[in-house]
Amino acid sequence: MRSPLLFSLLLVSVSFACKCAQRPAKEVFCSADWVSRARISQSITVQISDGFDGTQFGVEHVEIFRSPNNETFLPDIVHTASHSAACGLSLDVGEEYLLSGSMVNETLHVNSCGQIRPEGLAKEVTGIVIEWSNIPKDFPEEMKKFECPSKDE
């Protein structure tokens, strides 16, 4: 009796999991409002709305590769969903990552489908968001040369 119920629950949870299409790094970069090398300083669970939690990360933007209106400053708080099934990111305090996302009302947001995955990563590098130490050495310079169409087009 428990096996069919457990199987049904697993099937439902898998069907509601976050699914992302793989896209080239430049396409993800150009579709993002902001991209930075970010060091995580804090992680706090916050209530977004009735019954829904989110995670708020304190970040230090070590290097900014893309920002709205080419600003040299980005807010030091980044928001994401608390669960991977809702496309949320899990980030470790003290680690540095290549992060990219959207900016809505001066608030930074990230999700698993909007992360840049450089071509040529070592096979053992897995995961949705890439730790900075695993980014190919030439990729930061490559990002600086990306030419993106205007967001208005």
Tell me what each language-model feature is.
Residues 2-153:
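Transition segments tied to proteolytic processing and entry into folded domains
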